[in-house]
Every structure is written in structure tokens, then in C-alpha cells.
């Protein structure tokens, strides 16, 4: 079983740093699962082959990551509130 490494774009790391501990822990759990199975069809972002989302419904947060098979790395592209699709809009610019 291949385990991917986890990386962050600089902007995403800043966003990650602003999350409260509880939200961060929830994302950590989900990210740990995705590192062994990053390509979840239901979580794929439309119009993007390698980008996927993680939703935290209770906290109202979204995380967008990109799978880079050649480097075996999952890169967090954006983290943000669900309102106005903030995370998705940020991700498209990165």
C-alpha cells in the first residue's frame, strides 16, 4: 500500500495556521485517510483531474488538495470557510 506524503502551498499553510485546534484535528484525521487513498471519486473537484476536497460539515470548512502521483505527495492547496466557496475560489487561483 502506497502512502503519500503531505505538503502545503505557502498560502494554504497560513490558512491552516488560522484554524482552531478542533477543526485542525478533524482535517488531520481525514487527511491521514487520504494519504493512503487520495483519489476519492466522490470528492473530486469538477473540471480538475487531480484536485479533491475534504468537507467538514459541522465546522463549515473545506480543504482542497492536489494529488501528485509522480512525487507521491498530496499537496494542500487551500483551506477555508464554506461561505461563498472561499476555499474553492482560492484554489482556482493557485
Where are these regions (language model features)?
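A short, surface-exposed loop/turn module that caps and links secondary-structure elements
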Residues: 29-57
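Short, mixed-charge, low-aromatic patches
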Residues: 19-23, 44-47
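Enriched for short, Lys/Arg-rich terminal
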Residues: 1-7, 11-14, 18, 25, ...
Amino acid at each position: 500500500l502506497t502512502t503519500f506524503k503531505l505538503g502545503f502551498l505557502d498560502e494554504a499553510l497560513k490558512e491552516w495556521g488560522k484554524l482552531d485546534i478542533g477543526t485542525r484535528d478533524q482535517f488531520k484525521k481525514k487527511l491521514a485517510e487520504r494519504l493512503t487513498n487520495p483519489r476519492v471519486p466522490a470528492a473530486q473537484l469538477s473540471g480538475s483531474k487531480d484536485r479533491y476536497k475534504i468537507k467538514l460539515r459541522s465546522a463549515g470548512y473545506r480543504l482542497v488538495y492536489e494529488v501528485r502521483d509522480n512525487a507521491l505527495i498530496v499537496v494542500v492547496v487551500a483551506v477555508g470557510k464554506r461561505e461563498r466557496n472561499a476555499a474553492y475560489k482560492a484554489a482556482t487561483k493557485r
